[in-house]
Amino acid sequence: MAKIVDIKGREVLDSRGNPTVEADVLLDNGIIGSACAPSGASTGSREALELRDGDKSRYLGKGVLKAVANINGPIRDLLLGKDPIDQKALDQAMIKLDGTENKATLGANAILAVSLAAAKAAAQDQDLPLYAHIANLNGTPGVYSMPVPMMNIINGGEHADNNVDIQEFMVQPVGAKSFSEGLRMGTEIFHHLKAVLKARGLNTAVGDEGGFAPNLASNEDALKVISEAVANAGYTLGTDVTLALDCAASEFYEDGKYNLSGEGQVFTAEGFAEYLKGLTQRYPIISIEDGLDESDWAGWKILTDKIGEKVQLVGDDLFVTNTKILKEGIDKKIANSILIKFNQIGTLTETLEAIQMAKAAGYTAVISHRSGETEDSTIADLAVGTSAGQIKTGSLCRSDRVSKYNQLLRIEEQLNGKAKYNGRGEFRG
């Protein structure tokens, strides 16, 4: 049995040029596992705490030297001599050492980087791909599927500097026969979208997640230009390709109302739920994330009752990968899907528990990146190893996004038909 002999933390940069945490876990046989913690822009209020230094003389206060010191000090001391394969024991030990509900003492960014680095070291120690080790930890050894990518090709909201209120407009290649074919379809649509925008004289600069970020007449206008790009790429909207939204509604929820400032419209929860229902009737939108504010559970119930039978309603800020909050949502029949982000909860073990709880209740689980990413591609292995079926990892440019897609291509090739791509079968309706 290999043992942990050293743990090292360091400050590195994420895709927005902000510091984040990287950790190395070294074993006594020379194996090293390394992982980086991502960082979000539109964040749920109940997420685990990302520890920042607050020292305005460094990185505008966004340094993470405190989190790094926690890795190199108390976390290292705690885990030396431990077995990296016992992921649950490692994670529970760090949770206990932290002693807070939201990991505010050590920082979720510190704990997560070590948690994932340990998993990578353990996989190498067993001569397993990371996805196979994750499947073992998940209690589903040898069971894999390739995820349907939800490709964010128009960015708005907090992910872009434009007038579009809805944060993400995504395409899903549900008609593909494999992940690699789906990736090709999405990439072709992305390039055709650029041409559509250029023809309109619109900006083709990209946002945080690699999608285009033009100023448009309305949120629906984004759906129109995407529809045109899909057709120009030679695909049929609704059969080959479907659409998805991430409203990130908490970002435009003010005084109990939903304020679409880009359109000059203000809605009640009932009104905004009806607005979204109208979009699903006019376009093949089969998934909507954070359609209402994280605290507006009454509004979420209205939305779920209106369209939840046919549309995947994903809780991101709503559930923050937290099993306690997810259980409450399941009990109250709020939403029907959870977005899974490692750093919202802070350990691999708790992430797997959230996926398992969702699946047991008939909810889907969508594996997701954050807007602040690195070259770390762990979420690709997580999606395959848990057979989650869906992944959100941005658009078809920026290496911080493409690194995940490329890892999925490698995994699909390695599994050589043993991991099915289920396409439309992963969704409701």
UniProtKB/Swiss-Prot annotation:
Main location: cytoplasm
Binding site for Mg(2+): D246, E289, D316
GO biological process, alphabetically ordered: glycolytic process
Keyword Ribonucleoprotein: no
Family matches, as InterPro entries: Enolase, Enolase-like_C_sf, Enolase-like_N, Enolase_C, Enolase_CS, Enolase_N
Family statement: Belongs to the enolase family.
Protein name: Enolase
Taxonomic lineage from the root: Bacteria, Pseudomonadati, Pseudomonadota, Gammaproteobacteria, Pseudomonadales
Gene label: eno
